């Protein structure tokens, strides 16, 4: 999970516009009593413009697990606060009503994969004290929410990843602990997918270190013209590997970016100056060769 900047709401969910679908739906919902048997047509959030904007915001990834959403796992518009009913720990069945007045609220909408939404998050929305549970519009501010919202929280302050793909909550983080459980961010198949990415990144880190060690030896004999090509090849490979990791860490379109950032940031920063020197030297040499060819 990574922090995501929420964009301005699409026109259909402009709740200050009395002509918008969202506004009309909200007014109708306020006049409805929600029970198990209530059939209310929540439709505003299903508008194609809403889904498209959410997909763009989250770069085609699940807002919870950061997996790429593809044809084998369709995206679903997720209500952070459940719209119709709530699963409350310790209470059997669903509790009514849910946060019906937020069903068409842009700030309550995220996008998720089916696994996170249907199999795990479902209608759960744990808070610190049930007596503070909002039952009417405007009462949400009194809740101490126990789940991470990628558009409101910085997940990196609550979640910690290992280079094996394992996720843990940071000490003292109730939100981190509860989010891992409710979103099932520790589920086996998800951990295995993160592990594949982590293994590839860790391999590249080892290759960079090996390359730097090799380069150190080669540079002792840099006057030997027969070794120049080997030196150039080694430098090029080191730079390529470093850039791959750097670009992955900074590309929000990549899956499990949060994990990659955590397991690579120190490694990259500690070698940034050295890599820049190698790039400068390599570019200068290439420039000289081009000038020689041109002349």
UniProtKB/Swiss-Prot annotation:
Keywords: Antiviral defense, Hydrolase, Nuclease
Summary of the function given for this chain in its UniProt record: Component of antiviral defense system Septu type II, composed of PtuA and PtuB. Expression of Septu type II in B.subtilis (strain BEST7003) confers resistance to phages SBSphiC and SpBeta. May be a nuclease.
Domain of life where this protein originates: Bacteria
GO molecular function: nuclease activity
NCBIfam families, alphabetized: retron system putative HNH endonuclease
Name listed for the protein in its UniProt record: Septu protein PtuB
GO biological process: defense response to virus
The keyword Lyase appears for this protein: no
Species of provenance: Bacillus mycoides (strain KBAB4) (Bacillus weihenstephanensis)
This protein's record includes keyword Hydrolase: yes
Phenotype of null mutants: When this gene is missing the Septu type II system does not confer resistance to SpBeta in B.subtilis.
